Amino acid sequence: MPDLTPRTSNEDLTKWLTHPRYPRSNSYDPRWVVENQMGPNALWLLEWLAPALGLEALRPGARVLDLGCGRAMTSVFLAREYDAQVTAADLWIKPDDNAGRIAEAGFADRVQPVHAEAHDLPFAEGSFDAIVSVDAYQYFGTDDLYLPTLTRLLRPGGRIGVVVPALREEPQGLEPPEHLEPWWEPGYWCFHSADWWRRQWTRSGAVEVEAADWLDDGWRDWLLWCEVIAAESPEEWHRTMARQVGEMLRHDEGRALGFVRLVGRRKP
């Protein structure tokens, strides 16, 4: 890895983060993405989700809920890349904070930030053509009763798509994968396999599952991003977390950790 520091030029940072799998994301200011990240590279993950979710087929101005949007980078991406009218919902980032960032990006008329908790969403049934959630759904969506409530917000036939940190296989018993024990935290039990998620969504009866798959070499993308954030983030907490997660990913080498993509279509 190059010697990235807070003084690394945008040109060098752009070269390092340019990824052939994510051509749309490559067009965004890398410093803006680094400064506004809250975990794995959300733009990369959304770009991976988009084809399976059918975002390009949405009509101009389609209504999209970005659930757990963080600092609204994904919301800006949805408006810019897919001409969507986006509701950017988050619990932790204040709407005024996101509103400033959205306006600076030039999408104040297309992205509406709101403060909302995932179990108390202030929207009417059938309000959205699509729901997107990137690196957030694992924190509230493992509840077996949650998906039917959320998908009522979709028009009939509308799609929900999520990307979550995940495990390649479900652990057997009560212990985490042995090689990950030094880094394992209780919160990681919300990581599940693609099969686990497919089964949970299918059992809900709320959607027809159209995709539940694993990002090949996703751990490498995650590790690359951790290395950049550990060196470049302006926030010490994020630098520390990136170093810790990066150490775990290097040790794992894709044996257990990665990302799962899920897409479901609301049943009539």
Language-model features: where?
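A short acidic, Gly/Pro-enriched loop at the edge of an enzyme's catalytic core
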Residues: 119-130
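Conserved alpha-helix/loop element of class I SAM-dependent methyltransferases that forms part
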Residues: 39-60
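Short, glycine-/aromatic-enriched active-site segment of Class I SAM-dependent methyltransferases
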Residues: 165-188
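A short glycine-rich, Lys/Arg-flanked "PGG" loop and its adjoining helix->strand segment in the class I
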Residues: 144-159
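Short alpha-helix
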Residues: 189-205
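Conserved Class I S-adenosyl-L-methionine
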Residues: 210-268
